[in-house]
Regions:
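Radical SAM/AdoMet-radical enzyme domain recognition
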Residues: 37-62, 68-184
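A structural signal for short, well-ordered beta-strand segments and their strand-loop junctions
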Residues: 115-117, 152-154, 178-182, 207-212, ...
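Short cysteine/histidine-rich metal-coordination sites, predominantly Zn2+-binding motifs
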Residues: 33-39, 237-240
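Flexible glycine/acidic-rich beta-alpha junction loops that bind and position SAM and/or redox cofactors
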Residues: 178-197, 210-221, 246
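A short, flexible beta-alpha/helix-coil linker loop
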Residues: 24-28, 121-123, 186-187
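Canonical Radical SAM [4Fe-4S] cluster-binding loop centered on the CxxxCxxC motif
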Residues: 1-37
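Glycine-centered loop/turn positions within well-structured domains
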Residues: 11, 15, 123, 237
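Accessory C-terminal segments flanking Radical SAM cores
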Residues: 209-277
């Protein structure tokens, strides 16, 4: 049964991160109209039908959600009762350059968690993320001033981070917040074994996200075809890394009708990497 979803509310970004794996999927990214309100209504109906106590929802995907902040607010308002009751646990992930006090206050008031992408050491972050380090750090401190603690942080782990693992771990220790380390994939990617070895080390010192059947990119097992889905480009996909695979249905499909014929595979591995071998 589906209990979590991510919605990509746009396909555009104000940065040009060198490692962004969507650069390699341009033919699969398109601006087909997608009724996010209908999607949210389907999620609401699914929650009611199955009496779900918790549904996890991310406003995250192919682009920078803060570029369409007015639209994001309208989606949040549409499910505000479910957010405030805790039935939907919602979050968004931003590159951190478009944050301001009012936006932080709005999302916090509506119980939408904010994750900020920060690749650790300044020279590593700037190499990959369009020299945005200073702006991102300023806004992380702004978040702390507004909310009283640091936000969840997302760090993409490539060879640069592996080569300076101890320094990177020490860098994140100052924040005391939950860290999601993401395995760099695509042409600059690292192996799953390298990534998991880094996670094992980081988890000795940091509050590191390591899920169950979620995603190998974040240190869990692959949940493709199980309980989570990804909305983008007018479609529902088996996962955000698989928008270029033939596993999709229309974005307005009721959740009970979303069935992907994912074959049996070893879920310590990434389905995308298994399917494209």
């Amino acid at each position: 049964m589906i209990t979590r979803a991510c919605i990509s509310i746009n396909n555009r970004c104000n940065l040009d991160c060198k490692y962004c794996h969507f650069h390699e999927k341009q033919e699969s990214i398109c601006d087909i109209p997608m009724d996010v309100f209908k999607i949210l209504d389907n999620i609401r109906a699914h929650i009611a039908k199955h009496d779900l106590k918790l549904f996890k929802l991310g406003f995250v995907g192919n682009g920078e959600p803060f570029l369409d902040f007015v639209a994001l607010c309208s989606y949040i308002k549409h499910i505000d009762d479910l957010l405030l009751s805790g039935t939907i646990a919602a979050y968004t992930i931003t590159n951190g350059t478009l944050i301001n006090r009012e936006r932080i206050e709005y999302l916090s008031a509506h119980k939408v968690n904010i994750g900020i992408s920060l690749d650790g050491l300044e020279e590593i972050h700037n190499k990959w993320r369009s020299h945005s380090y200073k702006k991102v750090m300023q806004n992380i401190e702004l978040y702390h001033d507004v909310v009283g603690h640091y936000p969840a942080l997302n760090c993409t782990v490539g060879k640069d981070v592996l080569d300076r693992a101890d320094e990177t771990i020490a860098f994140f220790a100052r924040f005391g917040s939950r860290i999601t380390f993401s395995r760099m994939i695509g042409q600059y990617g690292i192996s799953l074994d390298e990534f998991n070895a880094f996670l094992d080390k980081a988890a000795l010192y940091l509050n590191v996200r390591r899920g169950g059947y979620d995603c190998t990119i974040y240190g869990g097992k692959c949940g493709a075809g199980m309980d989570n889905i990804f909305y983008a480009n007018g479609f529902i996909y088996v996962c955000g890394n698989c928008i270029d695979l033939p596993y999709a249905c229309s974005s307005d499909t009721p959740l009970d009708e979303v069935l992907f014929p994912v074959p049996m595979f070893y879920r310590n591995l990434c389905f995308k990497e298994v399917a494209t071998r």
